[in-house]
Structure formats: C-alpha cells, structure tokens
Amino acid sequence: MNNTSKIASYFLFPCLLYCVIVMSFVLFRGDRSSSTSKSIQKVYKSVVGIHVIQNVDERYDFQSFWDDYMSKKTIENMGSGLVLSEDGYIVTNYHVIEKASKIFIKTYNGLQYEVDLNNVYVDKLTDIAVIKINVEDRLYIPNIGDSESLVVGEDVIALGNPLGLFNASNKLTATKGIISALNVGFGFNKSSGSVYQDMIQTDASINLGNSGGPLLNLNGEIIGLNTFVISGSDSRGSIGLNFAIPINRVISIYSDLRDKGFVDRQFNTGIKVREIDQVLSQYLRLNSTDGMLVVDVEKKSSGENAGIEIGDIILEVNKVEIKTLNDIERVINEDLLKTGDNLEL
C-alpha cells in the first residue's frame, strides 16, 4: 500500500465511524419517537381540559337549623376528558363534574365551550359521565383499545390536565409508566356512591386534574380512564398508586348514557327472600343460618322462568356467598349489573 492509500484509509475510517455513530443516533431517536411520542401524537387532539364551577351550600354552626341563613360557596374544580365522537360527545369521571353549576370544555387548539347542563349524563355507580358540546368543526376521536388484552408490565401513558395546567397553558401533560396490576377491586364506596372494580393500576403519574383523562398504550390506543390515586397521608399527589377504569367498561356505560341518557338498573327478578335466623333455621331443620329463604316468586317473572320456587334457599349469587340481604345488594352493585344481565344463583 502506497502512502496515498494509507492517508486515504486513515481519513476514511474516522469518517465511516462518524457516519455509523450519527446514523445509530438518528435510528435511536426514530425508535424513541415511534413508541412514546407517536402514541401521544395519535391521541392528544382528543383530550380536553374541564373547568367546573360548583355552588355548594355552606352552613354555620349557630345557623344549622335555619335554611334561610345558608350561604353559597363557590368552588372551582379541574379535570380532564376524552372526545369519543366527532360531533362533541366527551367522556369523563362523574366526580369531576358532580354538583356543577357551570362546566367549561377546552380543546387542544384553545377553543372553549360552555356546556349546557341539560347535555350532561351521569352514572354515579361507575363514576362515569358524558358531556355533549355543540361544535361547528368535527372533533378528533382516538383509537380505542381492548382492556381485556392488557398485561402487567406493559408500558402506558397518562394524558391530562393536572392542576389545571392545560387550561392555563394550552399544553397537555404526559406521564409514562407501566401497568402495575390488573383487576384491582375496591368494592362499593359508600361515601362516593361509586363502585371501583377490576381497575387498572399504574405508576404513570396522575395528579389532581388528571381524572377523566385517557390512559393509552404504546400503539396510541385508549385502554383506560384515569380516575383516582392513593396518596400518602402528607400528600394529595401521586406516589405511584394510580388507578384507571378499563376502557371496555367506559365504552359500555358511554353507549348507554349517549343513547338513553341513563344506565337502566331498574330490574325486578320477582323473587322475595328473607334472612334465616336461628329460630327459622331450627324450624326448617337446617344446619346453619346461611343463605336467603325464598318466600315468594311472582308469576311470569325471570325468577319463575329460572325455576326458582318458594322454599328454595339461595346460598350464592354470582359465586359470592350470601348470608344477609346486604350481601345481595353488594353483589348487584359491585358487579355493576344492568337490566338484561344474568344472575347466577
């Protein structure tokens, strides 16, 4: 090899190495963009900020018996929402808009809409609400995923309006984490009147104002509705224990609220039961007081059609042991049963 060839080799090798490094960096950036960033880009136009004004009654101790002396206290609340139709149907959490006297929706492009409260439909039991706004231009709707196909450890992204930042700056906040657990159940919450069952747990940071915003996977598909956090005693912010309602349930409730304005849970099995106390147990020569005794079955009812007869003892409902009337009510609530659903006795 002559001197010219040696010089060319010495020059070309660093250049080639530099090109490989640059190309690797570009590819790395491309890979990063194709997962997290591109997923956010697919969804962010469908996320809205919600500003709620609530007028609540405030009593003073020495006036507690005189309604005429109650004053009105104005409270402002922030939340997030997700567009589910081009013509302006938005889903959020019920607790975000509870007791609202005014609701304002802000879209990704900075447009603000005041909501007609007659166009708000709620299901307190599932903590889901649907809002309709009147829009001139079509809104962007996201791709919906399948919350039944999720796996623990899967990467997820939370989008929303924490602490009202979106309302203030027109910029959504994104946080990333994994699915920490699936099918997490908290049962019926008496204070809120809502049931939180089969929740998605994630460590993607969720804070005040994120409620009602989407949880999405790295395909840019919505898999849940961010709902609440469990915080330490000294904090109201996220400590990595965050929970979302599975999107399959959200879509089911959304469809009922949009089409009918309510979720129909006014059903009647036609079965009347009573608890079995010690006296009744001895009279019937039973071995325990477990279960409910059937004392009447209405004609042509679903109970009669199922073959239930007077004198039967119901020991389980939907595979849950029954000992009191409250147990039956708890199963109906926690299973989020609607008219037309089946009960297994």
Question: What feature does the model see in each segment?
Answer:
Residues 80, 86, 99, 146, ...:
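Short, flexible surface segments
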Residues 45-51, 81, 88-92, 117, ...:
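Terminal peptide-recognition signature
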Residues 100-102, 139, 159-176, 185-212, ...:
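Active-site loop architecture of trypsin-fold serine endopeptidases
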Residues 73, 77-81, 141-146, 199-216, ...:
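Gly/Ser-rich catalytic serine loop of serine hydrolases
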Residues 27-90, 96-104, 109-114, 125, ...:
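Glycine-biased strand-turn-strand hairpin within the trypsin-fold
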Residues 85-167, 251, 322-323:
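Conserved active-site neighborhood of the chymotrypsin/trypsin-like protease fold
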Residues 1-29, 38, 118-119, 151, ...:
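C-terminal recognition in membrane/secretory proteostasis and scaffolding
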Residues 59-74, 120-127, 168-170, 182-200, ...:
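Gly/Ser-enriched beta-turn/beta-hairpin loop segments
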